[in-house]
Amino acid sequence: MTAPVKPANLLLVTHKVANYAKWLVAYEANDSLRVANGLHSYVIARGLNDSNTVMVANKMDDAAKAKEFAASPALKDAMQKAGVISAPTISYMDVQMQDTATNTANIRLMVTHKVKDWDAWKKSFDSHKQTRVDAGLTDRVIAYSVGDNHMVTLVFIVSDMKKAEAFSKSDDLKKKMEEAGVDGPPAFFYYTVAKKY
């Protein structure tokens, strides 16, 4: 029996744009620049609360090469020309699990937080799957930062926005996170999938 194939690692870039339609044209026109740096368009997302907050996920062949590209004047220039109006937040994700089953739900929740110990946190996280299902959340991606398994990023499909929001603010979740060794407050980002490649 062959071992399961590890999901592709991801480069996530989040920023605000002046005009989404104009930005998208410019983004897609620069595809050869990304491909030359081992990056492959995967998903474009728009913030649920602010649709001009855009998150781009690219499949990443090589984290070191991606980091060089992220720091390059060429990328800065391309972003400026595309109408990016905020400093980008850039993350390099070592993806541990990804559910790629087709799903028509379009809303996602990304949660990012620091953990004291990956293995202890993961064991606790796995034991609370039913709680997430009851809150209208389906596990989609489990990842940590390349080279640092203390910075965890999770993506969930949201089937019930009211339940998901209530759960994300609940004392129950806060308690479970503390027990699992989450260190500091989590960041929550609700978004819609605008385009898949």
Region roles according to the model:
Residues M1-Y197:
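Short S/T/G/P-rich N-terminal loop/turn motif that feeds into the first structured element of a domain
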